Amino acid sequence: MAQIKITLTKSPIGRIPAQRKTVVALGLGKLNSSVIKEDNAAIRGMVNAVSHLVTVEDVK
């Protein structure tokens, strides 16, 4: 499967608790931290929920 790189670019401080939990569930902690995840519907849904806080890149 394809993979995506997710980078936390904005702080979740002051966001609603569900968005903060989504950031943690994606494995992101500090600003500019990145994780590589499988590109599937579940991960895409989580990314869409916090799209204003993260950037997404395709990994080859």
Swiss-Prot record:
Question: Which cysteines are disulphide-bonded?
Answer: none
Keyword Ribonucleoprotein in record: yes
Kindly state which keywords UniProt assigns to this record, in alphabetical order. Ribonucleoprotein, Ribosomal protein
UniProt xrefs under InterPro entries? Ribo_uL30_ferredoxin-like_sf, Ribosomal_uL30_bac-type, Ribosomal_uL30_CS, Ribosomal_uL30_ferredoxin-like
GO molecular function list: structural constituent of ribosome
- Keyword presence, Oxidoreductase: no
Q: Which domain of life is it from?
A: Bacteria
Q: Name one GO cellular component term.
A: cytosolic large ribosomal subunit
Question: Which GO BP annotation is one of this protein's?
Answer: translation
Record-linked PANTHER family: LARGE RIBOSOMAL SUBUNIT PROTEIN UL30M, MITOCHONDRIAL RIBOSOMAL PROTEIN L30
Give the family per the record: Belongs to the universal ribosomal protein uL30 family.
User: Its quaternary structure?
Assistant: Part of the 50S ribosomal subunit.
Protein name (Swiss-Prot/TrEMBL): Large ribosomal subunit protein uL30
Q: Output the lineage of the source organism.
A: Bacteria, Bacillati, Bacillota, Bacilli, Lactobacillales
